[in-house]
């Protein structure tokens, strides 16, 4: 049986990367929420 997690750096960056987050209003909300919470890593 094939495992469900087949890692790809490109796919990860395009969907969860910093620039992907900054591209939309909701993504910016995510970044701001993580900044406010004091997260060390804001995005993948």
UniProtKB/Swiss-Prot annotation:
Q: Mind telling me which Gene3D superfamilies this protein's record contains?
A: 1.10.287.3980
Give the CC-aspect GO terms. ribonucleoprotein complex; ribosome
Under PROSITE patterns, the record lists: RIBOSOMAL_L34
Report the Pfam families cross-referenced here: Ribosomal_L34
Give this protein's Gene Ontology molecular function annotations: structural constituent of ribosome
UniProtKB keywords: Ribonucleoprotein, Ribosomal protein
- Is Nucleotide-binding given among the entry's keywords? no
A GO BP entry is:
translation
Q: Which NCBIfam families match?
A: rpmH_bact
Q: Which family does it belong to?
A: Belongs to the bacterial ribosomal protein bL34 family.
Q: What is this protein called?
A: Large ribosomal subunit protein bL34
